[in-house]
Amino acid sequence: MADVTHQEPQGDVTDASTFDTEQLGFMCGIEVHQQLATGKLHSRQPSELFDVTIDSVPEDWPRYARKLRLASGEGGKVDVAARFEKRRNRSFVYIQSPNSGLIELDESPPLSHDSDALDVALTVSAMLGAKPVGAVQTMRKTVVDGSNTSGFQRTSLISTDGTLKTDTGDVGIDVLCLEEDSARKLDTIPTDQGEQVIYNLDRLGVPLIEIATSPDIQTPEHAKETAMALGRTLRDTRRVRRGLGSIRQDLNVSVACGDRVEIKGCQDLGWIPRIVRLEMVRQVHMYRLANELRSSLGLPQLPPNRDRDDIGIESEVAEAVAKHIPLEYTDVTSAFASLSLIHISEPTRPY
């Protein structure tokens, strides 16, 4: 393939069909998260979801109030997201459903992996030709929004280096993991001490298979084809959950003149090509706007391939921009204090 990413991106941002994905240096990968129809991953509780809302939760279900504390990691540094969450000063209430116990409440150590969930993960690995790891070790991802009582999500790498066959072309499978799903948010209540978020623990700990592809997707339509092929592979095991919310696709999209952007929660497969195209166009549009602003200040232009950014030049640009846009904070609370909020019911125009 010829290197065309040295050229300026060609196309009209008002019409995504005018762009050539190859000329843009288009790259795309998909992450799929699929709930399994097994027991919970690190407790022997059933993965049953209860059809309740904040108004219909049975009164005899216990409730527990918690507040996450800021702490440094093993490297001695405090996570940026955790620091931001502390400033929000939120508290959390967890409703204990019949299928949640001490492990879900973070009052007891987790058990080993559910054997059925591990078997499904290895089955999918074999279907994708992925290579299982020598030993399964559980990692912890920081979660600070309160959706996990422990403050982190447990994830285990199961296999790597697989291949998904599609009509358009093969797509590499980088990793296949087993991880815990989060608790379900039921409501957010404003209080004098900050927001109080209410969670239902029925979904916490439900096993998820996470499959991350290589950036081998060639076109927006191929992204949809890949998502459909992954979903078909998972359903062929006959051991995954079905229905709304049981599977989620995250899209990673980039073009040469932009940056990698992760778009989370693409539920409707039919929307994937449109979402990918809009993200391609958005990145090109932001690139052009950035160069237009740089031209107005007499600053060097961004290269059409961001891999060729010059650190020295970008540092000088940052210093010049800081002189024109000083980072000063102004309290505008009084200007908006007398305003009232209204609900806009008129539908907005679609893109």
Regions found by a protein language model. Give the residues of each.
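Basic, nucleic-acid-interacting segments
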Residues: 2-341, 345, 349
